[in-house]
Amino acid sequence: MTTLMVQGTTSDAGKSTLVTALCRWLLRQGVAVVPFKPQNMALNSAVTADGGEIGRAQAVQAQACRLAPHTDMNPVLLKPNSDTGAQVIIHGRAVTSMNAVAYHDYKAIAMQAVLASHQRLSGEYPVVMVEGAGSPAEINLRAGDIANMGFAEAVDCPVILVADINRGGVFAHLVGTLELLSPTEQARVKGFVINRFRGDIALLQPGLDWLEQRTGKPVLGVLPYVTDLHLEAEDGIDVRQGAKDERVLKVIVPVLPRISNHTDFDPLRLHPQVDLQFIGPGQPIPPADLIILPGSKSVRGDLAQLRERGWDTAIARHLRYGGKLIGICGGLQMLGREVHDPLGLEGPAGSSPGLGLLDYATVLEAQKQLRNVAGALSLEQSPVAGYEIHAGVTQGPALQRPAVQLADGRSDGAISADGQILATYLHGLFEGSQSCAALLRWAGLADVQQIDYEALRERDIERLADLVEKHLDTAHLRKLCGVA
């Protein structure tokens, strides 16, 4: 059994992408490999086969390994629900919400969960490919660390350090990070990978030579800047779009402070007939064919922000002019009469009026609903698959016109009597080509092109493995992975 860890000099250095690439590259070599991230902080999560939730990056990495996502792949998930606090999820299940100080004291317990998951995976797979979090050199976070070197020291594994040259200062990032580590941690770093390089590699070579001489550690390769790679972002919203047809559907997503699972919109971003715009604070909602209210980790707080920004008025105007509106998960809850949080699960206990566009109310309960589901959209009876991650129980007359009939016999969500508003708890409803096409036709797009989002994701994972083969020292990587 071998464990290899990828750490980064900064957030968004390329850790998730590199782990995904290495997982598929190893799989091509006939090696059974499994992804692992000790601790993740993200509002994008995926439902696992064992009924829990993990970070979506680990779900993509599982796909790279051709494995079903499992809670052991990300034993600790932190989902921020305020500027200073987060919901703590252990082995896929919400334990409690804590502020940063309380979680610091809780880390020893969290580490036990991390090590238990790693032990199970390492007993089943010959290679465990680990992703760190942020940077290992955050001085204020090093005590009790479970996400980076604290984990590497505990399981005695080698580390690859990756840095993003596109940001500038790559040599300072690498050398500075190394200098801030302890001697034993420095010894764990077996090499560097430089990510997102553009230009002539010959011009970079003197710097690479200096880095190897300065640190005594090898540069394992330089990965190029790739502009059209479309894998799900771990947390930041990806606003890139490809070339669009002239006849497009204009779709607006208001970005709320605690937006969650915004990867729901990746298929729309890639669709050639959709002009997807994320609207932030201070921006008015422009004329559009479709507005989508996304998921939220703090529904009442985000409702207050929506009103403060005047977006409730803009949504009402949009509907008066015949536009379509979708609410997903937290967005579904916002569309109703009221949202009640008697236990204070997402902030101070209390109730808030919803937008009042659909006749139902939601009560947030401690037991979270986590399941992968399939069924048929009420629109065209198109097949749909997705997943539920929500603490709300929603009841009211509007649910008598459901948006989805689920294969397990339940119904989900609602469609307004005038057909303008659709609400659903299902994340991922745009990923299926037929369900996506049905929703786009409902929103007003004629002659919809069907795209195979799963095939696009698989194509990009294969491209990442190709980059490993072409640009990294695969012989050295095989040694680090214990592969002959």
Swiss-Prot record:
Source taxon at top rank: Bacteria
Record has Cell inner membrane as a keyword: no
Stretches assigned to the GATase cobBQ-type domain: 248-435
Keywords for the protein's UniProt record, in alphabetical order: Cobalamin biosynthesis, Glutamine amidotransferase
Positions annotated as active site in the UniProt record: C329, H427
Any GO BP annotation: cobalamin biosynthetic process
GO MF annotation: an example: ABC-type vitamin B12 transporter activity
Pfam family, one: CbiA
Pathway: Cofactor biosynthesis; adenosylcobalamin biosynthesis
NCBIfam families associated with the record: cobQ, PRK00784.1
Function of the molecule: Catalyzes amidations at positions B, D, E, and G on adenosylcobyrinic A,C-diamide. NH(2) groups are provided by glutamine, and one molecule of ATP is hydrogenolyzed for each amidation.
Entry similarity comment: Belongs to the CobB/CobQ family. CobQ subfamily.
Name the record gives this protein: Cobyric acid synthase
Organism: Pseudomonas putida (strain W619)
Gene field: cobQ
